[in-house]
């Protein structure tokens, strides 16, 4: 990955492996995977690529993926593709490809610039919020369907209204709680159950207000709870 998020459990796992990073997926394995998944499906297929940072595998990998989907989709199934990216280094060519092939792209942005940069520096320790925000705008300008994923840690939970205001313009948002590691140690960014509940309550109030004012924002788990 080209970022070093403070809460990343993959980074800790890499340090403990004999081989830090496994070899990239071979073309043969990609071919077999796509073929078997499509042949086993009844009506629809969804491929999702996520971190580390999946875009680092390069554009040719995704181009080959789409070629294989077209080759093996002899029953005209509905096939969708999605990528979860940190949004730090997407080329114009990759963005154009995602638009052309109708990829759904999730971008990680932890609320405000302050809360994001506190937790999500690049590999050299530099802030990344401004670059990520620019990437989101580039994706949207290209016509790519985008949603924003925000990790709720202790710092984010203390600023629910600021975080909502920062993310609401992107319209489609997901929140996931930042859990402590299995070692049981708490950290300066740890999220308590009480803090998460308070965050969700105020976020719901803002979500409801935006809806009543004709400015609806989609927050996936709130949508799901309401639909239950």
Regions found by a protein language model. Name each.
Residues 52-53:
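Active-site neighborhood of divalent metal-dependent phosphoester/pyrophosphate hydrolases
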Residues 185-228:
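A C-terminal junction/extension of Radical SAM enzymes
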Residues 12-16, 114, 180-183:
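A short, flexible beta-alpha/helix-coil linker loop
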Residues 30-48, 57-178, 188:
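Radical SAM/AdoMet-radical enzyme domain recognition
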Residues 1-25:
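Canonical Radical SAM [4Fe-4S] cluster-binding loop centered on the CxxxCxxC motif
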Residues 1, 5, 49, 83, ...:
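Conserved, mostly hydrophobic/aromatic
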Residues 21-25, 57, 123-127, 191-198:
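Alpha-helix N-cap and loop-to-helix initiation/capping positions
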């Amino acid at each position: 990955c080209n970022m070093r998020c403070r809460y990343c459990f993959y980074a800790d796992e890499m340090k403990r492996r004999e081989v830090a990073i496994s070899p990239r997926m071979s073309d043969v394995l990609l071919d077999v995977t796509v073929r078997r998944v499509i042949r086993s499906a009844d009506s629809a297929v969804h491929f999702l690529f996520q971190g580390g940072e999946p875009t680092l595998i390069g554009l040719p990998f995704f181009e080959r993926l789409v070629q294989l989907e077209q080759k093996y989709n002899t029953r005209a199934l509905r096939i969708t593709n999605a990528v979860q990216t940190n949004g730090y280094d997407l080329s114009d060519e990759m963005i154009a490809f995602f638009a052309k092939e109708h990829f759904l792209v999730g971008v990680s942005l932890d609320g405000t610039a302050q809360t994001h940069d506190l937790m999500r520096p690049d590999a050299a320790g530099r802030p990344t919020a401004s670059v990520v925000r620019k990437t989101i705008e580039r994706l949207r300008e290209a016509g790519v369907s985008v949603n924003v994923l925000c990790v709720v840690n202790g710092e984010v939970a203390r600023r629910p209204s600021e975080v909502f205001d920062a993310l609401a313009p992107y319209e489609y948002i997901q929140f996931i709680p930042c859990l402590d590691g299995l070692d049981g140690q708490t950290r300066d960014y740890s999220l308590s159950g009480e803090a998460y509940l308070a965050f969700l309550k105020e976020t719901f109030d803002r979500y409801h207000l935006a809806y009543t004012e004709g400015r609806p924002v989609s927050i996936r788990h709130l949508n799901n709870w309401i639909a239950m």
